[in-house]
Amino acid sequence: MIVSLIATVLFGYLLGSVSFSYIIAKKIKKIDIRSEGSGNAGATNTLRVLGIGPAICVLLLDVAKGVAPALLAIALTNGDYPLVPALAGLAAILGHNWPIYFGFRGGKGVATSIGVVATLLFLPALCAGIVAILSIVFTKYVSLGSLLFAVLTPIAALIMLPFFHYPLEYIYLAVLLAILSLWRHRTNMGRLIAGTENKLGKKHA
């Protein structure tokens, strides 16, 4: 278990540190995505700066960064030690947010968090995801949808716990990710309250 834990956490962090938005922006426009638009290295800013095609690629790749370490950890431990996939997934998110290859300046970890919790807590993540998507469709605020997903996933998991008996390690992880997401989106929350947050489809002011 210790070897699997170390291996998957290391794998998760190193994979999470691969900033696909940075790499794709450099490849297409030879720019640092962190110096453009909102300055965030993620799919939403990629959409603003590069368009829908590159943004979809970044979104899918960032989600995959969360799925891969969690699945690998489950496979290596036969699902017997839920702490291992939880920490491997967390490591991937920390890698995305603070990537070792790019000066520890990354994104907010939303897509990678989706990959992790969708792997470990599929139904709660699905329910939270539906609410998040609807909020984005009706309000055009991606940050609001991201926050709703982060907060509602652990709530949904707790509601479903008597029926699905999710490992508590997964619940704790979801709560921790919600707190991390709130902190990473603190400036967005300020703009949402002030009514100055950027809407989907509009260029960053």
Curated annotation (Swiss-Prot):
**UniProt KW Transferase keyword:** yes
A Pfam family matched in the record: G3P_acyltransf
Q: Which GO terms describe its molecular function?
A: acyl-phosphate glycerol-3-phosphate acyltransferase activity
Q: Which GO terms describe its biological process?
A: phospholipid biosynthetic process
Task: Give the primary localization class.
Answer: membrane
Q: Which UniProt keywords apply?
A: Cell membrane, Lipid biosynthesis, Lipid metabolism, Membrane, Phospholipid biosynthesis, Phospholipid metabolism, Transferase, Transmembrane, Transmembrane helix
Q: Which residue windows are coiled coil?
A: none
**Pathway(s) per entry:** Lipid metabolism; phospholipid metabolism
Could you list the residue ranges that cross the membrane? 5-25, 56-76, 84-104, 114-134, 144-164, 165-185
Query: How does the record describe its quaternary structure?
Result: Probably interacts with PlsX.
The entry assigns this protein to a family as follows: Belongs to the PlsY family.
Q: Which PANTHER family match?
A: GLYCEROL-3-PHOSPHATE ACYLTRANSFERASE-RELATED, INNER MEMBRANE PROTEIN YGIH
The record's annotation in HAMAP family points to: PlsY (MF_01043)
Instruction: Tell me the protein's name.
Output: Glycerol-3-phosphate acyltransferase
Species of origin reads Shouchella clausii (strain KSM-K16) (Alkalihalobacillus clausii)
